[in-house]
Amino acid sequence: MSTIDHLPPLRSVIRDHDLSARKSMGQNFLLDLNLTAKIARQAGDLSACDVLEIGPGPGGLTRGLLAQGARRVLAIEKDARCLPALAEIAAVYPGRLEVMNGDALEIDPLSALTPPIRVAANLPYNVGTELLVRWLTPQIWPPYWQSLTLMFQREVAERIVARPGSKAYGRLAILAQWRADARIVMQLPPDAFTPPPKVSSSVVQITALPAPRYPADPYVLSKVVAMAFNQRRKMLRAALKGLGPDIEDRLLAAGIEPTERAERVSLEGFCALARAVAAT
């Protein structure tokens, strides 16, 4: 039994409930409760927060969040095989764990959550980026969440915190850093999971700012950035020609040379360009 919550070790839970990870669901289960507890601590003081968790699987991180003192955890799990294991956790923490069986891409969790809200998850790799983009692109800011403590494949994590001029710099970096602080807070080796993935994983902490760093319309900025990085090796005057025949004038108005490439334009530069495009 675990000294954290007197529940069985994760290996036993996975064995007893026959929870072999399914590649089709993007599953890689964390095995070490010390690691899940460490991830939960990265989310900060949870005693006054509801926590949204996506893809809890056998419940390793769920247990860490509850042991860390989370006021309440709402866990969305698509794989019905995991529900009995999660029910065992709920029995140890009465009234503090609610489990929804469904697809996180199709469920609106807000009605089941009470602010303040934080998100913590070992995201299934096949939906992680899409969920992150949704969390980062609401029209209204600040968002419903205070912070996101999320595990990704290391390559994705590096894209979130990347700086201009690096190969990893792109849309994710701009969306994450425009209205939030983003940093990598943990690295995890493949053998921390079952089955072991081919690459290392990283935990990223994203904390919402009260307001954007620079003014810009979210829709326009997202559109401009997507177009620019879809053809990142092209000069911006070519990559953005779909925005209109006067795109060179708009680039110059934003202080950007039309011959520049997307990977060398700063966040401030893209926001200036979004304002110039919106002014047309």
UniProtKB/Swiss-Prot annotation:
The keyword Lipid biosynthesis does not apply. S-adenosyl-L-methionine binds at residues 28, 30, 55, 77, 103, 122. It comes from the Bacteria. GO terms for cellular component: cytosol. It holds the Pfam family RrnaAD. InterPro entries: KsgA/Erm, rRNA_Ade_diMease-like_C, rRNA_Ade_Mease_Trfase_CS, rRNA_Ade_methylase_Trfase_N, rRNA_adenine_dimethylase, SAM-dependent_MTases_sf. PROSITE patterns: RRNA_A_DIMETH (PS01131), SAM_RNA_A_N6_MT (PS51689). One of its GO terms (molecular function) is RNA binding. Its main location: cytoplasm. It catalyses: adenosine(1518)/adenosine(1519) in 16S rRNA + 4 S-adenosyl-L-methionine = N(6)-dimethyladenosine(1518)/N(6)-dimethyladenosine(1519) in 16S rRNA + 4 S-adenosyl-L-homocysteine + 4 H(+). Keywords: Cytoplasm, Methyltransferase, RNA-binding, rRNA processing, S-adenosyl-L-methionine, Transferase. It is found in: Cytoplasm. Its EC number is 2.1.1.182. NCBIfam families: ksgA. Specifically dimethylates two adjacent adenosines (A1518 and A1519) in the loop of a conserved hairpin near the 3'-end of 16S rRNA in the 30S particle. May play a critical role in biogenesis of 30S subunits. This is Ribosomal RNA small subunit methyltransferase A. It comes from Roseobacter denitrificans (strain ATCC 33942 / OCh 114) (Erythrobacter sp. (strain OCh 114)). The gene is rsmA.
